Design a protein with these regions (language model features):
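PLP-dependent aminotransferase class I/II
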Residues: 1-117
C-alpha cells in the first residue's frame, strides 16, 4: 500500500523530497484527510508536483489531455517531512503516525515497502 519512489540505477538523487506512493483508493482513505490528520499531529506534508498537463497554462493552450500514467502517479504521491537534521525518532514518529492514520501497522513493515529499489 505504501512504497517509496523507485530510483533509477544510473543516477544519484538529490534527496530534496521524501515522496511516498500511497494507494489511497485501495486503503479507502482520501489523501486530503491524511494530510489534515498529519497536520493536526504537527506533521506537514505536501503534494509535489501537479502534472504539467493539469497546469492551467497548458490546459488553456492544449485543452484537456488524458495522461493516465502521470495522473495515476499524482493520485498516489505524498511528500513527507525531510530536513538535514532529521533524527531517527522524527522519522519513526512520521511513519508510525502515517501508518496509524492509514489503518496499517508499521512495526513489522508488512504494509510498507521500505526499499527504494
Amino acid at each position: 500500500y505504501v512504497q517509496p519512489i523507485k530510483l533509477a540505477h544510473n543516477c544519484t538523487p538529490a534527496w530534496h523530497l521524501s515522496v511516498a506512493l500511497i494507494d489511497f483508493d485501495a486503503l479507502g482513505v482520501p489523501r486530503g484527510e491524511v494530510i489534515n490528520k498529519l497536520r493536526l499531529l504537527g506533521i506537514g506534508t505536501q503534494v509535489h508536483y501537479i502534472p504539467v498537463h493539469q497546469q492551467p497554462y497548458y490546459k488553456d493552450r492544449y485543452g484537456i489531455l488524458e495522461l493516465p500514467g502521470a495522473s495515476a502517479y499524482y493520485s498516489k504521491c505524498l511528500s513527507l517531512p525531510l530536513w538535514p537534521a532529521m533524527e531517527s525518532e522524527d522519522v519513526d514518529f512520521v511513519m508510525e503516525s502515517l501508518a496509524k492514520i492509514l489503518g496499517l501497522t508499521f512495526e513489522d513493515n508488512t504494509n510498507f515497502d521500505t526499499k527504494a529499489n
